[in-house]
Amino acid sequence: MESMEEKLQEYAQLLVQVGLNVQKGQTLVISSPVECAFFARLCAAEAYEAGCREVVMNWSDDALGRMKYLHAEDDVFDTVPLWRRHFYNDYALEGAAYLAISASDPENLKGVDHGRIVRAQQASGRALKDFDRLQMCGGFPWCIASIPIPSWAKKVFPDLPEDQAMERLWEAIFRAVRISGDGRCVDQWHQHIETLARRVEKLNQLNFKSLRYTNSLGTDLTVELPEGHIWEAGNDVTLAGQTYIANIPTEEVFTSPLKTGVNGVVYSALPLSHNGTIIDKFHFVVKDGKIVEVRAEQGEEALKAAVTVDEGASYFGEVALVPYDSPISNQKILFYNTLFDENAACHIAFGEAYPCLQGGQEMSKDELKARGLNDSITHVDFMVGTADLNITGTTHDGREIPVFVNGNFAEGI
């Protein structure tokens, strides 16, 4: 059985060797909260061990971020400094690897003016459009992972003292990323990626025209898929041929919907933590791809702001299939962190579409839009999977094939 120190070392190795597959001579940019500095250093050490040219740090702090939204002068939220544009765009053009350590208080921005948050997001989208485009199209390897911080742990385990909540969240994260104490997580990840790849191959062979989602919450949503769409999974490849895993953990296979081909109503299955606000018990009414009605029992104002960041925010960019009986779902923990919660259930994203088309990585933004994919500066996943979710795929010749039955993949998928 590994010690905590050994598990942390194994986690850092997993992110550098498998998540990013850092190459000799490659630059690594690590974005991390200051609270996670000890783990960022472990990742940096692993990267240098792998022959990394340089590790560049990009620090953040929840408390300072909240202060800025509450007290900074108003025009600050409409601009992005030139140095910040160069920081992201220049390293991306160089082909640097990007590691984001995601750890924050799910309610850090509760009570903050949503208008300021939206304007800051819009300004960032304009300034970093080259970076976002390269990220979506395989211009560089990137990986998002998480470690606990006290404010997050207490949200997940509110009835426990802080030290016990932290211990429980560490245990849950290690289980989710397949670190069991036997030192075999890298091998297990290679096997897991092979399993996802086989599922992708089957879905691509079926080449569905549309998917219909139904469950007892009231979801009845038909999602048309674009001509030439492809399903993808956790293992990505850059344009330069470097393999990487964008999310650790990942349990999903995903594709992009036809922008104007989504119709019906879809209900959330889990709360969504977005921009420091908890949004819960919500649903969308969708017509010709566009969200035309938004309702939420908690956080409705924040949700309405999220789907109006730009024109594309009110359309969809991803549909992802995750079995209800997944390693994360079976822990029966609500993480209040999309990285984990999206891998506990099927999810859909509003906003930017991934270029999930044959030859999509090489297409320009205009070409992707012409093929029916959505364009936006945002991409927000929300969970729709339940124990009774059924998904039926319709082929181009009219056959109806079960894809999900009672929350899990149908036999043969």
PLM ranges: what are they?
Residues 110-113, 153-158, 235-236, 277-280, ...:
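A short secondary-structure junction signal
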